[in-house]
């Protein structure tokens, strides 16, 4: 046989689908790869039989339901897309929610990927030293500061008491940021870095431990020498 890569993939899909049918026949509930392979195989066979795209879109959501699959599989498969060869060419069949609700009640358990958190409010940076200060952007372009940037070393055009900000970052959720437009004055709350206190990189002012007084003095001297406002 001289098979193209697409035809080889089709045989792999068929093998997975046959395994799914065998396990389903034993009464086993299918996992994500098994369910995906079975539905895709049925759609491709329908295309080979000459059925239309519209017909197969509807058919794709009748093959399996939540009674046939493991808990959470339906949530992992909100959309299934498979490219089939039809009498008038190759077309993409898109089936939304291919696994519809069955008759059995769904198990009350976490959904794959669900974030579980306590019922109470989450305390951010609880117990660490904090400081509140006012800073103004004296530059002519916006300055955006990420949650864990060493605030002492931010853009030199930002004017604020830098010594107060040594060893601290913005007290905001990780991955968020605060933006200062040109001329904007705003109040921010800072919190001390956790861990060992070793700070390296950023603007190259610190490169040491925030708990070391000598490191702080040297960082302030570098900031003044490089004309960081507020130093």
From Swiss-Prot:
Region (Urease gamma) location: 1-101
Gene3D superfamilies: Urease, beta subunit, Urease, gamma-like subunit
EC class name: hydrolase
Any one annotated GO CC term: urease complex
Biological processes annotated in GO: urea catabolic process
Region of interest (Urease beta), residue spans: 102-231
The reaction(s) this protein catalyses: urea + 2 H2O + H(+) = hydrogencarbonate + 2 NH4(+)
GO molecular function, one term: urease activity
This protein's record includes keyword Signal: no
UniProt keyword terms in alphabetical order: Cytoplasm, Hydrolase
Compartment(s) of residence: Cytoplasm
EC number: 3.5.1.5
Pathway: Nitrogen metabolism; urea degradation; CO(2) and NH(3) from urea (urease route): step 1/1
Pfam families (UniProt xref): Urease_beta, Urease_gamma
Oligomer and partners: Heterohexamer of 3 UreC (alpha) and 3 UreAB (gamma/beta) subunits.
PANTHER family in the cross-refs: UREASE (PTHR33569:SF1)
Family classification: In the N-terminal section; belongs to the urease gamma subunit family. In the C-terminal section; belongs to the urease beta subunit family.
Protein name: Urease subunit gamma/beta
Organism from which the protein derives: Pseudomonas syringae pv. tomato (strain ATCC BAA-871 / DC3000)
């Amino acid at each position: 046989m001289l098979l193209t890569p697409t035809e080889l993939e089709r045989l792999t899909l068929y093998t997975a689908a046959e395994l799914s049918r065998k396990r389903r026949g034993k009464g086993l509930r299918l996992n994500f790869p098994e369910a995906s392979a079975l539905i895709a195989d049925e759609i491709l066979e329908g295309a080979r039989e000459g059925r239309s795209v519209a017909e197969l879109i509807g058919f794709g959501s009748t093959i399996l339901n939540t009674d046939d699959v493991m808990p959470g599989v339906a949530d992992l498969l909100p959309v299934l897309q498979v490219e089939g060869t039809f009498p008038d060419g190759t077309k993409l069949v898109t089936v939304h929610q291919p696994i519809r609700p069955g008759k059995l009640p769904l198990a009350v358990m976490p959904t794959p990927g669900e974030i579980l958190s306590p019922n109470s409010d989450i305390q951010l940076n609880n117990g660490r030293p904090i400081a509140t200060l006012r800073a103004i952007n004296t530059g002519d372009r916006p300055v955006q500061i990420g949650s864990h940037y060493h605030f002492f070393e931010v853009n030199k055009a930002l004017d604020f008491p830098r010594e107060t900000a040594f060893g601290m970052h913005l007290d905001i959720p990780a991955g968020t940021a605060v933006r200062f437009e040109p001329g904007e004055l705003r109040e921010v709350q800072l919190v001390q870095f956790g861990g060992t206190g070793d700070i390296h990189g950023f603007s190259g002012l610190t490169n040491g431990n925030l708990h070391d007084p000598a490191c702080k003095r040297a960082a302030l001297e570098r900031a003044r020498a490089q004309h960081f406002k507020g130093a």
